[in-house]
């Protein structure tokens, strides 16, 4: 590696500095010339008369020309479609003119603005022991009476039936405990009389 002499180094720095300063001055001159051209733009842009073949437009002519030549567009045919079908795709063979019954739109998803709760309640069977739901005494009574009608005449079956159906009601309404027992005794007595 050669050692650069001080004279060569000074020449190199002077050349680069002069090059950089000339670029700065040229940029300033361009900016100034742009400013001068903007100031002088009004001088050049002033109308000096109309060249041959051109004519000027008056405000009245422009006003008369405008609204008469505007083409008014009618509303699109999509707006004539019912609102319930507006977001539905045109697939699965559905046409724009096709009419549907109210029952067909009831099963559409929430995206089309329908509520899903009604269809979910219809599809999900009543599962009393799931999800923290309890059964009512009436449903248990009805179910047990339907299943065990033949074997209800023995005292053990009556006690089992009473304990299964009334335990839930006794917890909820302890003051009605005695009246429920009396009701079952009357039912048992009536069944015994029917057997005889």
Swiss-Prot record:
Family stated for the protein in its record: Belongs to the FARP (FMRFamide related peptide) family.
Provenance organism: Homo sapiens
Residue numbers carrying Phenylalanine amide: 92, 131
Highest rank taxon of the organism: Eukaryota
InterPro entries: FMRFamide-related/fGRP
Annotated GO biological process: negative regulation of gonadotropin secretion; neuropeptide signaling pathway
Broad class of where this protein is predominantly found: secreted
Signal peptide bounds: 1-26
Transmembrane segments: none
Propeptide: 27-55, 95-99, 115-121, 134-196
Intracellular or extracellular location(s): Secreted
Name of the molecule in the record: Pro-FMRFamide-related neuropeptide VF
